[in-house]
Design a protein with these regions (language model features):
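Single, functionally critical "micro-switch" positions that shape active/binding sites
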Residues: 2, 199, 223
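Sec/Tat signal peptide C-region and signal peptidase I cleavage site
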Residues: 17-21
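Bacterial N-terminal signal peptides
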Residues: 8-14
């Protein structure tokens, strides 16, 4: 298989994944799989079981849909094809709040809870689970105000990685959690993260071109030596 074909395929797949994500599927849960010895995230539809975005690092969730739990929600969920592997979701320290044009640090905190394990954004924390066939796990995400006070409405950004024995830890991915703000605002806040925090696949193109150029240069040098 030629070097040109391999690189072209990588670039095409990267661009296709962004195009797919830009279609704004109604909802994507977190899909955890492995690629080249590292954990990676994509988007999947937990209803159909279909992976709808092979590469995705920004996810959405709604808080307060259940009036009994006005500051909590269970989206995004998590699925994986790594059956038999214990995954650890790492909630990173600190959260941010959407200000209409970007994010600023928030004094609030977030809990991500599953099976009696509470990961807090105050100092960073984690929870673990075993991947079983057909896994459809939905942690509880809870927004906490200061000093026991209720948090105010807003759109909040939390950061995660996922790890597992035998694999390199994933790149950071994000959940954009909406507490009683409009879907338009939620969409804008999500789009900002996609545009500003996630490396664009277009950034791969110069590296791929350099890779191709170096290959052609080596080929020319080898051809010249052979002719001599």
């Amino acid at each position: 298989m030629s070097r040109t074909f391999i690189v072209s395929s990588i670039v095409a797949a990267s661009i296709a994944s962004v195009t797919f994500a830009d279609k704004k599927e109604p909802h994507a849960d977190i899909w955890v799989t492995a690629l080249g010895g590292s954990l990676v995230t994509g988007g999947w539809d937990h209803i159909t079981g279909e992976v709808i975005a092979p590469s995705l690092r920004v996810f959405e969730g709604e808080l307060g849909l259940d009036p009994l739990f006005p500051f909590s929600g269970d989206e995004p969920g998590i699925g994986s094809d790594l059956v038999g592997t214990t995954l650890t979701m790492n909630l990173l320290q600190g959260i941010s709040v959407w200000n209409g044009s970007g994010y600023t640090a928030s004094p609030y905190s977030t809990l991500a809870s599953y099976a009696g394990q509470d990961a807090s954004s105050i100092a960073g924390g984690s929870f673990s689970f075993l991947v079983s066939q057909g896994l459809d796990l939905h942690p509880e995400y809870t927004l906490l105000g200061n000093g026991g006070a209720d948090p105010v409405n807003g759109i909040y950004l939390v950061s995660f990685t996922v790890g597992a024995p035998g694999y390199a830890t994933s790149d950071t991915f994000w959940a954009v959690l909406n507490l009683n703000e409009s879907e338009e605002a939620h969409g804008a806040a999500t789009a900002w993260v996609e545009a500003n925090l996630v490396p664009a696949p277009a950034a791969l193109v110069p590296m791929m071109l350099a890779f191709l150029t170096s290959g052609r240069s080596r080929t020319r040098r080898q051809s010249t030596r052979a002719a001599c």
